[in-house]
Amino acid sequence: VRALITGITGFAGGHLADVLLGRGHQVFGVARDEGAGLQYLNPGISPVIADLQEPAIIEKLLDDIQPDAIYHLAGQAFVPTSWQAPWDTLANNIRPQLNILQAMVNRQSTARLLIVASNQVYGHVETSQMPVSEETSLRPDNPYGVSKVTQDLLGLQYHLSHGLDVIRARPFNHIGPRQSPVFVASSFARQIAWIEAGLSEPVIKVGNLDARRDFTDVIDVMQAYALLVEQGQAGEAYNIGTGQAYSIQYLLEVLLSYTNLSIEVKQEADRMRPADISVIYADNSKLRAATGWEPTISFEDSLRRVLDYWRAEAKSNRK
């Protein structure tokens, strides 16, 4: 299988490349810039540096690579950024998506396209609606969520109107090594690693600890992407999550249990988010029925992987 990954130097992209290589696929990648993620890529992959805002570039990629599968991971992935820069978030997430779909039509591509939406498409869900199935109405409550609804529905539209082979993935929170420290697990783990290395005071800064989220290790999410491309049904949407919700408080406690230091926890107002819902977790039965997918890495082991990554980073920062 010739697989093209957009955003290959991003957090998820590098992990997906490893998963697909492990499945014997030929992997090609495209990235907006060289980026820090380049160092983690398998040396056999040299990504094309290109701007997916340009339609002609995507047509050339399709001509040159002739992919059997396209995993569209590129985009602006952080909810708070979407409050600060809503228009940029919409442009960065919607335009490349539309360009890829239109390029596939123009080039009569029969590739299977995996669109990465998000649990943020569901947005404002009541606790009584848990777990969230793919039938739950889409009520995004931030600009990032709106951009992801648009990507998801553009995929559906091009499947219905042009017969494109599209799968719509709706991953819930994923965590793992190399994730940006703006995300909660990475943020806490990095702070602990920096404190252990003597690079920071023994205080960990946190936001809302009561929120409960469905966290899946990035490797398990990437395996789900690969399985959906192999076995999913064209046009369908699939939730990806463990089906369990863990509080941010518990996430913090697990990470703190991995260190011998005594660390003060300090809640900060600027780490609180507007419109934060208290709990969300996935009904993943559709994904499991279609592919047999099961998560393989426990929440606790996943957090240990994150902390070990930041400990290694702290060591190299101390030199």
Q: What are these model-predicted stretches?
A:
Residues V125-P131, L153-D214, V218-L227, G243-A245, ...:
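NAD(P)-dependent short-chain dehydrogenase/reductase
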Residues N42-E54:
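Rossmann-fold cofactor-recognition segment
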Residues V221, Y225, I240, L251, ...:
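Non-catalytic, hydrophobic alpha-helical segments
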Residues R2, F299-K319:
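Amphipathic terminal alpha-helices
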Residues V203-I204, N208, G235-Y238, Y246-E253, ...:
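C-terminal "lid/loop" region of Rossmann-like NAD(P)-dependent oxidoreductases
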Residues A3-R23:
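N-terminal Rossmann NAD(P)H-binding glycine-rich loop of SDR-like oxidoreductase domains
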Residues L52-N92:
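NAD(P)H-binding glycine-rich loop region in Rossmannoid oxidoreductase-like domains
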Residues Q84-N99, R112, Q120-R168, I175, ...:
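Catalytic helix-loop patch of NAD(P)-dependent Rossmann-fold dehydrogenases
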